[in-house]
From Swiss-Prot:
One of its GO terms (molecular function) is lipid binding. Membrane-associated protein that warps the membrane surface to access and bind aromatic isoprenes with high specificity, including ubiquinone (CoQ) isoprene intermediates and presents them directly to COQ7, therefore facilitating the COQ7-mediated hydroxylase step. Participates in the biosynthesis of coenzyme Q, also named ubiquinone, an essential lipid-soluble electron transporter for aerobic cellular respiration. Belongs to the COQ9 family. Present with 3420 molecules/cell in log phase SD medium. Pathway: Cofactor biosynthesis; ubiquinone biosynthesis. It comes from Saccharomyces cerevisiae (strain ATCC 204508 / S288c). A 1,2-diacylglycero-3-phosphoethanolamine binds at residues 189-192. The keyword Magnesium does not apply. This is Ubiquinone biosynthesis protein COQ9, mitochondrial. One of its GO terms (biological process) is ubiquinone biosynthetic process. One of its GO terms (cellular component) is protein-containing complex. InterPro entries: COQ9_C, Ubiq_biosynth_COQ9. It is a peripheral membrane protein.
Amino acid sequence: MLCRNTARTGCKFFRLYHSNPIEHVKPIHIKPLTYGKESPQYKVLSLALQKFVPEHGFSERSIVESLNELGYPSSMISSIGAPNSPSFFHSSTAVMELIKFQLVDKRYRLTEGINPDVTPQYKLPSLEHLLLKRLEMDKPIGGHLSELMSQLAIPSAFLFETAIPELHRLSDDMIYFSNEKDHHDSAWYAKRLAVSSTYIGSKLFMAQDKSHNYKETFTFAKDKLHRVMRLGEYYNNTEEFAWYTLMSTVNLIKSQLVRG
């Protein structure tokens, strides 16, 4: 296990068995996006997410509105979706890229300014703080979360190549950049499954939440995180706990989808 101040060179984008410093480098390109922050694609998708998705949802209209405002031709929408393979289950490769962009961009913005290499662990934010901060980022698109979660849950290459890997990267980052004590054995997986379960459950709750400023969502998230992490401490069999958290997530998704 490399220490956190290990020199970071030759980094490739893959997840190691444990959290590792080389995985959390802030690169010029925000992997797995294939374009940098100065590219037209990034600018179009960033503006679409900030200004037009809150009104029009994850749709081609949001992207076209962004293209128009930035002075790009509407035909550019085809190149925006180019990184994605056409899917029978998803109507637009450009919308798929917009969804991917919001997952990746928010994950990186969540930990901006946090450097575990130089910051004492006790001064790092709590896991709960990062979880709530990530949910806070979705307030502007709260009215479109049901649509988003439905898109992400469609069995497809996009689910297995983008949505699930990004969920695991987010969970890994929330633990790595927090003051949460990590484990370097099989419990590493259990903790990340617990955080993934909490995050997915909170997002599904948020999609149905009618309370002012999503107050009930944040109460739910704090309570669920506490219960899941505490339950993990009581399980001596890490594999059993990992299956418990995984099945909790699957069952919750199924119940929400049945409700429509």
